[in-house]
From Swiss-Prot:
PROSITE patterns: ACTINS_1, ACTINS_2, ACTINS_ACT_LIKE. It comes from Magallana gigas. Pfam families: Actin (PF00022). GO terms for cellular component: cytoplasm; cytoskeleton. This is Actin. The keyword ATP-binding applies. GO terms for molecular function: ATP binding; hydrolase activity. Keywords: ATP-binding, Cytoplasm, Cytoskeleton, Hydrolase, Nucleotide-binding. Actins are highly conserved proteins that are involved in various types of cell motility and are ubiquitously expressed in all eukaryotic cells. Its EC number is 3.6.4.-. It catalyses: ATP + H2O = ADP + phosphate + H(+).
């Protein structure tokens, strides 16, 4: 879609990162942290053109003097004032568009409370004056991006993980499972186990350093116990990382102990099942006739599925739970970090989708509840 003058906007608001761009593009134009920062001390930033708040990368780069807040927790918006700041920043600073000129497709977590989708709808029409909008479920978009309409999506981002069985394009709500265990918890856990090694990471700014260590050095072991044995008997798994101040730290078994919590939440003191068992439970809640199609199409999505080794481990664990003759296939698309956004870009540019938008006129006639009738 060359004519950006009318291109729809696609905005995927995640707990950790916001992905935004134009429908029809193959990747988001803007990817920035879903953070709003406010100065810790009034007046400390003399001459820096004191603003009362910073969003995204700017908040990230000035993190040393700001208190950082994430308005989206566990995939669900909890702070609407800050969320509005993020949307404002998305339209005006990142995409540089006038929101009143473009339809906008937003994404939501599965099982998002009804009041939340109404609030999103209200803000788009009343604050930003959107001509049209739509709210789509994140996991469904990821499945579209993989070229399928049936499968089970394990979507794991920064704030929440979900297993969402989808049949012929429709999510099956009774079988959706939510796991409040995702990237941010793994970052916190890595902070904790690095402290046991004698390194101290505590502030919100230091957490960002640990997140970087996690993204660069962590991986999922195919056999956890065996990997622990290897790590104990040799230094072959050790890697070093240089901190911003030049200090070099070494990390060993932490590299795979951190993401292991996705399979063994008991590491974090949680009683829930791991992602493999949660996926299996989701499949078992579905009609017996479609399970075979789900087992053969387990699609990984979201940044927390980017750990090397996760697909093989998932394949191994689900195979152990499933009936012995069942064909199991775990699909890990290389672009899965952005597959929700990509699915949104595909959906919003389909000619058949154009009648699905909620128009400003429909909103004015029916109010925010229109979203439940038109988006499902």
């Amino acid at each position: 879609m060359g004519d950006e003058d009318i291109a729809a906007l696609v905005v995927d608001n995640g707990s950790g990162m916001c992905k935004a761009g134009f429908a029809g593009d193959d990747a988001p134009r803007a990817v920035f942290p879903s953070i709003v920062g406010r100065p810790r001390h009034q007046g400390v930033m003399v001459g820096m053109g004191q603003k009362d708040s910073y969003v995204g990368d700017e908040a990230q780069s000035k993190r040393g003097i700001l208190t950082l807040k994430y308005p989206i927790e566990h995939g669900i918006v909890t702070n609407w004032d800050d969320m509005e700041k993020i949307w404002h920043h998305t339209f005006y600073n990142e995409l540089r568009v006038a929101p009143e000129e473009h339809p906008v497709l937003l994404t939501e977590a599965p099982l998002n409370p009804k009041a939340n989708r109404e609030k999103m709808t209200q803000i788009m029409f009343e604050t930003f004056n959107s001509p049209a909008m739509y709210v789509a479920i994140q996991a469904v978009l990821s499945l579209y991006a993989s070229g399928r309409t049936t499968g089970i999506v394990l979507d794991s981002g920064d704030g929440v993980s979900h297993t969402v069985p989808i049949y012929e394009g429709y999510a099956l709500p009774h079988a959706i499972m939510r796991l409040d265990l995702a990237g941010r918890d793994l970052t916190d856990y890595l902070m904790k186990i690095l402290t046991e090694r004698g390194y101290s990471f505590t502030t919100t700014a230091e957490r960002e350093i640990v997140r970087d260590i996690k993204e660069k050095l962590c991986y999922v072991a195919l056999d956890f116990e065996q990997e622990m044995t290897t790590a104990a008997s040799s230094s072959s798994l050790e890697k070093s990382y240089e901190l911003p101040d030049g200090q070099v730290i070494t990390i060993g078994n932490e590299r795979f102990r951190c993401p292991e919590a996705m399979f063994q939440p008991s590491f974090l003191g949680m009683e829930s099942s791991g992602i493999h068992e949660t996926s299996y439970n989701s499949i078992m809640k579905c009609d017996v006739d479609i399970r075979k199609d789900l087992y053969a199409n387990i699609v990984l999505s979201g940044g927390t599925t980017m750990f090397p080794g996760i697909a093989d481990r998932m394949q191994k664990e689900v195979t152990a739970l499933a009936p012995p003759t069942m064909k199991i296939k775990v699909i890990a698309p290389p672009e899965r970090k952005y597959s929700v956004w990509i699915g949104g870009s595909i959906l919003a540019s389909l000619s058949t989708f154009q009648q699905m938008w909620i128009s400003k006129q429909e909103y004015d006639e029916s109010g925010p509840s229109i979203v439940h009738r038109k988006c499902f």
